[in-house]
Amino acid sequence: MYKRQQVVGRELAIAVLEQDGGPTVLPVVEAVPVGDVYDFEARYEAGATHLVCPADLDSETTAKVMGLAAEAFGALGCSGCARVDMILTSEGEASILELDTVPGLTQTSLVPQAAEAAGIGFEALLEQLLKLALTRN
């Protein structure tokens, strides 16, 4: 059994997209639950969470969490697309919760929303991911 102290703070999701042979970090998404916690219901129940993209973070914090996401993507040898979920504490410390190498790709999922904020439409995102997959054999 693995136990860890609960980390409380802001829920952030940072999508990393492989472009031109390297990682491109998309705008940060913040999930603000209507209730107290960002749990299963808050994640999947319509209207239970407000998504803010780009997240309302200062430039230093934005650069820090985007850099951490890119570093995790590279360290784990990821390709294509991944979503890095983090908690940002009130002290400004970022903790990675998970790195999802198969993130949701519906039009309401976090990665397509971040891509849209970066000027990459839903169809263009899917086309890019398919092209990347085809080049990998």
Language-model features: where?
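Intrinsically disordered, low-complexity proline-rich regions
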Residues: 1-2, 125
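Phosphate-binding site of ATP-dependent enzymes
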Residues: 3-67, 93-95
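ATP-dependent carboxylate activation and anion-phosphoryl transfer catalytic cores
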Residues: 56-137
